Each structure stands twice: as C-alpha cells, then as structure tokens.
Amino acid sequence: MLFNLKNLYRITKLTQNSKHLPRHFCRGPPNQMNVCLKGRDLLTLQNYTADELKYLLWVASDLKQRIKDKGEYLPLMQGKSLAMIFEKRSTRTRLSAETGFALLGGHSSFLTKQDIHLGTNESLTDTARVLSSMTNAILARVYKHNDLDLMTKEATIPVINGLSDLYHPLQILADYLTLQEHYGGLNGLTIAWIGDGNNVLHSIMTSAAKLGMHLRIATPKGFEPDLRITKVTEQYSKEYGTRLLLTTDPLEAANGANVLVTDTWISMGQEEEKRRRLKAFQGYQITMQTVQSAASNWTFLHCLPRKPEEVDDEVFYSPRSLVFQEAENRKWTIMAVMVSLLTDYSPQLQMPTF
C-alpha cells in the first residue's frame, strides 16, 4: 500500500475535531522506522510518539551530515514557501528557520506584530485561511498557545509552534540532538532543570521519558510547572519506567544529573515581575558548586539569551557547556521538522543510537 493504515488512522484521529480532512498522505518509500509525519502540525511534543521524536532527530542528524559535513545540496524545499508570524522578538528561531529554509531551496516571509495583528486587524480564522492559500507551512511565535490551537483548526497547511506561553518544542529537539551527539545516546540520561517552570521545561516534561531520560526539576515555590503538564509527566514516567523528581532544592535536583539545564527567569511579557522574580530565584544560579553534585560527565544547556544571574561564567563558558552547539542545532532540527512535515523524505544515513 502507498501508506501505512496505522499512520492514516492516527492522523485522522488527531484531526477529528477539525473540519478539514488529513492534509497529505506519504507516497515515498517507507523509512526504517515506518514513520510518516507529512501534513502534521507541531504544536507540542506531547502529540508525538517516541518513534516520531526519534525520527525527527534522525532526519536532523542526516541533514546535518549530508549538507554540512559532505557538502551536498538538497533542494527539498524548492518551490515551497514558509509564512513566519512572530508576535515576540527572536534571534535563534528566526535565523534558524530563515537560513534553514533557504538552504533547502525554499522562500520564507517574515511577518511581525507590526505587519499582522493576530485576531485584531484580521481574525485568526481569516489569517489561517489566507496563509494556507499562499504558503506551504506556518511557523508562529505567539503569546497565547490558544491562538495556535485555533490556527491549526482553520489552516489546511502544517502549523509549527515557534514558541508559545506553554511550549517551545523546537528548542527541545535541538537540545536532544545536541545531547545525542555528545553522549552517543539519550536513553538513561538524567536531566536536571533548575529554574522557572516555563514553556521550555514543559516541552522537556512532555518528551524526555519517551526517550528514556530521567528528570529532576527544581523550581521556587510559586513558579512550578503547569499542574496539568505535571500530571501528564507523571503518567509518562510510569509508562516508560523513568524517574521524576520535583523539588525546591537546586542541589537536590542536580544530584547525579548528567545534564544541567536552566533558562531565563524573566520571560518575554514578564518584565513587570522582574524584581519579584529575581528575589524568588535567589540561590538558583548554576555555579561550579552546583555541578559538584552532578554526575562526573555533566554538561550544561541554556536556550539563550543568558543572564549572569542564571548561570555564572565559569560554567557557561566551560568545556562542559554545550550552549553554542545547542544553538547551531536549532537550524538542523527546524530543517528536519520542515522536511518531515512537507515531504516524503527518508534519511539516507544510518539511524543514530537513541
């Protein structure tokens, strides 16, 4: 058959609340994992299975090796266009999308809140329908995740979450690719999150267990992750046999961890809370004292931009810090997402160990 019936059923199930039929069917040769993502949205990693996450990372690794290391030209996006709607400022998400899409032969159009006001000058419904008629995919960075949900119901093309108040899936795919490259695999690693219970953490929580990673989370009281997401994470931990710890003690979270992760304490839109947040997060800076509690092979990740109060220079610029490899991998993982959602591409290189 031209496509896997199981995948067709799953795609139909995911879109059953939409008036639209499944957008595409995979017509290419089956890949080693028998995964088809063409036509899917990417709003949260919660909607992706373990095999689907591994497939995205495999495609990212494949594209990186073929294009960067071997110098191949792969015009997989030739004739395709990407609409980029950004309500918030961005460096890495915008650059990785624009340069990655161009590297694959496609064209991107960048629209800021000065160009388009979601739900203000024009309804989300109308915006999604217009963009669907002119482009092949939408990458949106928004304040409210609900806007993405509505957009996916009205769009007939894939919608990709470039960051919302709830999730940042593209960042976490880059983190996982970076860790896979460094450690040679992900299964069995312990991630320690020390900081705010924010969108980046939520994306880790909804995916780490699927890849066999344990999670230790330290947040100040009042800054815990969303309770709904915590419940899902607890369920995943039981289902996949991983360990989960939630605490207010940074050193307890760091104990035995392979990967130490933090992020900004003051996200975009929270500037008025700066004084209160800086006070609440005292003692949460990652320092060499923190890493003494970690595993001997510890590494450090930060999605950037970084402030010194979040992590000191000694850790941030140490050989154990993978932040700049992590930043580069934003490009390869977003390219993998676009290729997977828009084409029938099958990786040519051997699947990495996960």
UniProtKB/Swiss-Prot annotation:
GO terms for cellular component: mitochondrial matrix; mitochondrion. It is found in: Mitochondrion matrix. Keywords: Amino-acid biosynthesis, Arginine biosynthesis, Mitochondrion, Transferase, Transit peptide, Urea cycle. It catalyses: carbamoyl phosphate + L-ornithine = L-citrulline + phosphate + H(+). GO terms for biological process: arginine biosynthetic process via ornithine; citrulline biosynthetic process; L-arginine biosynthetic process; urea cycle. GO terms for molecular function: amino acid binding; ornithine carbamoyltransferase activity. Its EC number is 2.1.3.3. Residues 1-32 form a transit peptide. It is an enzyme of class 2 (transferase). Optimum pH is 7.5 in the presence of 5 mM ornithine. The curve shifts toward a more alkaline region with a decrease in ornithine concentration. Pathway: Nitrogen metabolism; urea cycle; L-citrulline from L-ornithine and carbamoyl phosphate: step 1/1. Induction: By diet of egg yolk in animals which have a high level of OTC activity due to presence of OCB gene. Cleavage of the precursor form to the active form occurs only in the kidney. Its main location: mitochondrion. Inhibition by ornithine increases at higher pH. InterPro entries: Asp/Orn_carbamoyltranf_P-bd, Asp/Orn_carbamoylTrfase, Asp/Orn_carbamoylTrfase_sf, Asp_carbamoyltransf_Asp/Orn-bd, Orn/put_carbamltrans. The active site is at C303. Carbamoyl phosphate binds at S90, T91, R92, T93, R94, R141, H168, R330. Gene3D superfamilies: Aspartate/ornithine carbamoyltransferase. L-ornithine binds at R141, N199, D263, T264, W265, I266, S267, H302, C303, L304, P305, R330. Catalyzes the second step of the urea cycle, the condensation of carbamoyl phosphate with L-ornithine to form L-citrulline. The urea cycle ensures the detoxification of ammonia by converting it to urea for excretion. Homotrimer. Belongs to the aspartate/ornithine carbamoyltransferase superfamily. OTCase family. This is Ornithine transcarbamylase, mitochondrial. The lineage of its organism: Eukaryota, Metazoa, Chordata, Craniata, Vertebrata. The gene is OTC.
